[in-house]
Each structure stands twice: as C-alpha cells, then as structure tokens.
Amino acid sequence: MTLLLALALAAQGGVATQLSPAPLKLWTIAWQRPLVPPAPLQYQPRELGGPAVDPVSGIVVVGTRDGWIHACDHEGRRAWDFRASGAFDAPPRIFEDVVIAGSSDGHLYALELGTGRLRWKYDAQEEVGTTPAVSGGLVLAMTLQDSLVAVDARTGEWKWRHRREPKEGFTIHGGAAVAVAGGLAIGAYSDGTVAALELQTGTVRWERRVAPQGDFMDVDGLRAEGGRLYAAAYSGAVYALDLQTGAELWALKTPGPCRLALGGGLLVVVTTTQVIGIAPHGGVVRWTMPLEGEPSGDPVAVGARAAVPNTKGLLWIDAATGRLLRVFDPGTGVSASPAFRGRRVYVLSNAGDLFALDVV
C-alpha cells in the first residue's frame, strides 16, 4: 500500500523523486597521523600552530599546543621531534634548510630542516604567536605584545625592535604576521595602527591608523602584493593602502574582519560572520558567503578555490562564485591554516591529528 501511494504521488508532477546530488569529491585522504595525546577533561581543544611544507623535500613541519614541533616525510613517517617550553600558536616558516618558529615561551627557534637540531634561539621576552618572515638576511616576527623584532637569520643575533604600547584592556588573541615587500617590514598593532619600517634598520617609513573606534581595534590581517598593502581591522574595516606611502586606495567597512588571503586575482576576507571575495584593485565585493562557526587561522587561496579554517572544519569555497563546495570535518574542527604542496594539502585538526589530503 505504501509503495502504491508513493508511486501515485510521484506521478503527480510537484513531488521530487530524485535523491540529492552526491557531495562533490575534492580530495582523498592519503594518511592521518595523531600528534597530540588526548588531554583529560579538556573541553573543545584548539590547535592554532598548523603545518608548513618544504617545496623541495616534501617534509612537513607542524607546531602544536603542547610545545612540540613534529616533522614528517611525504608518506607520513616521523622524521624528528623538537620540544620547547611553550605552545606554538602559528605555523612555522621553512626557509632553505631551516625551520623558524615562534613560541608562547617567548623564543624564536631556528632548527635544521633535515634533523631538527637547534641552530639558534632568540629570547624575545614576549609571546611569539605569529609566523615569522625571512627577508634580506633577517628573521622578522610580531609578538603578541605589539613588538616587531628582527634578528640575523644565520645567528639569531638581535638587529632591531619596533614596539607600540598595547591597547589597554582586552584584545583579540593572535594577530597578523609581519608582511615584507618593497624593502619594508610591515607590522600590525592592537591599537589599530599599521607601521611600515625600513627592512634593514627598523626606521619608520610611515604609520597609519586603519581601525575605526571600537572595543577591539586589533589589526589582525595583513597582505602585501603589487605595491599595495591590505589590512583587516577587527573593529570594522578592510583597507588597501599604497605600500610606499600608506595613502588610502580604498576602504570597505564591514563588521569583524580578521583574516586575509590573496590569490588568483581575489582578496579573501574572513569576518566573524561571513567570507567575502573582493577585487583587490578596486575594492568591489564580488561575493559573500555566510559563515557558521568561529574563524581562526589564515585562509589560503589556491587556483580556483579558497580554503578557510573554521571550528566547523576546513571550508572549501569556489573562488569565482563564493559557493561552498565541501567541508573537511575531522570531527573537532580546524583552527590552523592548511599548507599546500602541489596537489597535496596538510591539515591539522583541533584534536591534534595531521591529515594529508590529495586534491582530485
């Protein structure tokens, strides 16, 4: 009787009989490696450190919240491990044969890529919660207390420091990594200021406040490309500035912008409520996509897709339309930025498992 009723209803036009389309296949899981042991009674853990991958050897290096840096080869075999005394809250930087990472214990560490042996460490005396940059023989890093430090890339010897007094009261945890372009090192600060400094000396070329007045004025996203600097201020604005002068090129007012990515002729902006695709040269909004879950690490724009870390998982978005294609959900969400090497993508889950995905 039930079957006859279903057939009769299907014959009446207006009743759908087709199943929903199968999810779009974007990747296969090549391997999974647990890196962080489960902690008892830990509620909703978050792994902010994330992976970096060497484009030559394929070695992937991951910093985790329990103070370890782990290195694995392309097949997921453990290569080496290094222990610090504080958490790693941003992906490391691989430069030539060296891994450089900042820790909440206040140190910058330089390790040999092949062995994990400590080459040098620098005591910044403040939490280093951003990915270091390497340029002009210098390692540059922002601390979480609003200092931009520069040290010799070979020895770790101090070269210069630029500091602004942190804004009083609470600020958003984390911050923007140093951007380097055009002979300048650009830092972002919790008082809403962006400062462009001469790379070799730390001399201020220009400073500009980009954050509207508000409770949280942190500048949490920076990207530089093509003579332009893009900045995201949490209190409600995305700016494009002339890299050499700081002059405003365009501004977009939107609540809660906190992370940026550039790629494929698109500026991807992640806010607390949505993801926005913007034309970098004119500031025209091409698309918006509502965001569920909390944003965290920096998005990555690669080719026709953008990958956005989120407490719901790693969101895969069509860069041309803003359509959500798939979500890679390891069960605990993804707070760290992914790392790409060719068709291979490395993702660290909030449970501390490292996944290797092969994009199809």
Language-model region placement:
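Short coil/turn segments within WD40 beta-propeller repeats
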Residues: 67, 105-107, 146, 192, ...
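Blade-level signature of beta-propeller repeat domains, shared across WD40, Kelch, NHL, RCC1
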Residues: 330-360
